[in-house]
Amino acid sequence: MNLERLNEIEKPLLHIVKHDVVPALGCTEPISLALASATAAKYLGKTPERIEVKVSPNLMKNGLGVAVPGTGMVGLPIAAAMKVLSNTILIELLIISALLHQKVCSISTDRLSKL
């Protein structure tokens, strides 16, 4: 792409795309919840005994039936729990990709409270 030919509107947009768009694995809703729970667990400093999350109606609607990569499970409860119950490193929005090679079968939806 010839940057000299970009107009004044296109240049800032291209800058945003180049610097602010990051890779993500999975769908937005489960990833956002996994990222939030991972961040909370990081600041807590230990594995929480219980996870309680509050989400918007739109996130709930869009995320309840979404498959969480590497788990064979669907929904927001597994997305919220999987990072907290693992000991993997938070890698920005690739949080779920770090778990693909780990056993997540031990995470049972019976152990998860409904949102």
From Swiss-Prot:
What molecular function terms (GO) are annotated for this protein?
A: L-cysteine desulfhydrase activity
Q: Which InterPro entries match?
A: UPF0597
User: What biological-process GO terms show up in the record?
Assistant: L-cysteine catabolic process to pyruvate
Family, as annotated: Belongs to the UPF0597 family.
Q: What is this protein called?
A: UPF0597 protein NTHI1023
